[in-house]
Amino acid sequence: MRGISGFGLTSLALSAGLANAIDLDVNNRDSVLKASKIVVDNILSVYNNYTESPGGIPGLLPQPYYWYNAGNMFNSLIKYWALSGDQSIVPTLQSALVFQLGPDFNYMPPNQSKSLGNDDQAAWALAAMRAAEYDLPVPNDLLSNNITWASIADTVFKEQVARWDTESCGG
């Protein structure tokens, strides 16, 4: 599975204007949180500038980033939220995770059908699993349909297992 590389994440942060060094003391929790907030704010600046522009779609990043990159980014942002307690990003996380679900709540949205593969879908399912692990609040419109982050991840897993084909491609 492809992942967002350190280079890709660094490029995304730099494209938001983060070109100066960040003052960081890795032995000081407050310093780590402050440095993390700077990086997160810059990443979200790129994301928000794209999604709030005409034609922007919640959960997607601008070119050259792919759909799975956004899924991996949100997975990381969920962990940041859980470790930092930064509640300001919860609506952004929820919006992205829900908008990219697709009509069957399985991270197969019609707007990604041209290039969607198991690895891409799994990137988003892993973000949903992390959301479940860290108790990211589930939006009421999902809860009212008995849908949780864990049930979404489970749905994707079951769909991918059902697609497993050892006959034509060795699995």
Task: Spell out what each predicted region is.
Residues 20-111, 144-170:
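Low-complexity, Ser/Thr/Pro/Gly-enriched N-terminal "stalk/linker" regions
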Residues 1-25:
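Fungal secretory targeting signals
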Residues 77-80, 127-131:
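The core hydrophobic/aromatic register in alpha-helical repeat solenoids, strongest
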Residues 4, 137-144:
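Short, flexible/disordered intra-domain loops and linkers
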Residues 81, 85, 132-139:
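Short coil/turn linking the two alpha-helices of tandem helical-hairpin repeats
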